[in-house]
Amino acid sequence: SFVDNSRSRLSREVKIFFPHGRRIARISYLCRGKNAGYMAERPLILVCNDDGIDAQGIAALTSMLLPLGDIAVVAPDGPRSGAACSMTVTSPVRLRLLERAPGLTRHSCSGTPTDCVKLALEHVVERRPALMVSGINHGDNASVNVHYSGTMGAVLEACMKGIPAIGFSLRTRDSQCDFTPYSDTVTRIASHVLEHRLPQDTCLNVNFPQVERLRGLRVCRMARGKWSSEWEPAEEPGTFRLTGHYTCLEPGAEDTDWWALDHGMASVVPQQTDMTSTRRADALKALETMP
């Protein structure tokens, strides 16, 4: 970084190396005015995922968020899809520093996405994150898929720690997909949460359809759905491979995430850590008087 006093400008450049050296993103931060020699502390943003530290999605997400604050990436050292909120309880977890640059650190973790968040808060960051962001996941986490999601497992862990948290996912399995069409929406949502925070015990599950241009954004609820035919025999006798067929149980419900994705819109679903079914509690009051 350098200070150009004649033009009263502070400029800082950070390089983000994408997986396998495919491309480099350079972001410059400029501060103008009479106090240009002084830069206020930028918000700290914790970044995680469940596809692993080398996934394209987390590299793209990091570049999108860099203009908004200092970034601490702590992500699994390999794919952890379907990890949900699981954590490592039977063996030690290894944390490795991969990169340290102005405004950016990157660590890999041998554990789950939940482990990554726990370790980051206790052994990586030196101040409390203003925001935690997970993704961008290769594959949507809409409808019931949110319950299996390691992407959202990391988000829920941060939310339980009182940190505003967002999960971003893309409806695709293409490991080399283009995340550019979603950049503006990611930064707009992240900026809004940084400024206004979120209600207590509430986080956001954001999903994108794979389109060249979004048709809009819909704040909605998760659709009811189910999986069937989930296991098929593998080559070795007695072993099985996860597969499955998803069915949306309310495909015509326009207030759901699945409908929004089917119609080219981003879906934003507020999730909460309190899983109490308060609407059903009264119907079960009879249990209190059972003999």
Give the role of each language-model region.
Residues 51, 79, 112-113, 137-140, ...:
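Short glycine-rich anion-binding loops that position phosphate/pyrophosphate groups of nucleotides
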Residues 154-158:
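Hydrophobic/aromatic ligand-binding patch that stacks against planar heteroaromatic rings
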Residues 40-41, 45-48, 56-123, 127-128:
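A cross-family phosphate/adenosyl-ligand binding-site feature
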Residues 140-149:
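Glycine/threonine-rich flexible loop motifs
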Residues 159-181:
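Glycine-rich phosphate/pyrophosphate-binding loops
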Residues 131:
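Short, Asp-centered acidic motifs that coordinate Mg2+ and/or phosphate
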Residues 179-291:
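Electrostatically charged, flexible surface regions
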Residues 4-7, 15-24, 29-31:
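Short terminal hydrophobic/aromatic SLiMs and anchors at protein ends
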